């Protein structure tokens, strides 16, 4: 009814007081008890998300050209899943539809030739809202490089070890995520490790990818503590990546953080400018988010977009395996860099 629809929660509501889920989930309903005046208040929720707007339907007769970015980010899906599992309703800024679509595989036909690295999969179906219209679905599939085909990888792991990363779903989960990555590396690859908190530093100089013990030892000694000077860590990571630059390989920084940069010289525009400039030197920056309450998705998205990398969110060990193991080739090795076919445009 009309009155009933008014009582339904709107997507813009960031938190709901009660959520009842059928099946194996238990209703997240607060008991009817008086608040404890002596209770210690929890940490405030400071999660930040980029503002989103809904694209309107456009007439192709008036606007025949549509431009869109070919991104493979999937952070919004995993983060929304985390919120739902906590009994919370994701807000409209937290749900980016294209990242929900990116999360799944669609069994599109794989390109057979790396020199023609995209296949086009087109289907036509009747429109569900107008029997006189049809809908065209265009799916693009990129070329998947095998382990033997891929180039060497110069990977700098940039880990946030500030106090905000102490929770089990932050630095401890980030360490487990890195462990799932290591079996994909070999002697062609080099791994470095930079950490940042109140200050930044190198904890692992360039090390061959098959020297797993050295990499694990450097990582397992890390503990979370202190404030977050993220900008300094990023600049140091770029310096280390440049020192070990692989001309015929892929040079990438992987930032693992909750995005809560809270001390130091942190000018978002300056940081984005630095990253965009470094992008031109052939060094990619990908961002992997962890945790909640202070998760800064807005910063994460801006860094990844300016760094020509991907943005993903890790909420479980299963998701870590998907990103760093199962989709290792997809997430680490690009098949094209801002190419444009001048002869066809």
Residue ranges, per PLM feature:
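N-terminal plug
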Residues: 23-35, 52-58, 90-91, 108-111
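Periplasm-facing N-terminal accessory domains of Gram-negative outer-membrane beta-barrel systems
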Residues: 1-17
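N-terminal secretion/transport leader regions
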Residues: 16-25, 35-37, 304, 345
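Negatively charged
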Residues: 36-89
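Extended, small/polar residue-biased N-terminal targeting/export presequences
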Residues: 82-85, 89-135
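Exposed acidic/Ser/Thr-rich ligand/metal-binding surfaces
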Residues: 4-5, 114, 118-339, 344
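Short, surface-exposed loop/turn motifs at beta-strand boundaries within globular domains
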Residues: 14, 61-63, 73, 131, ...
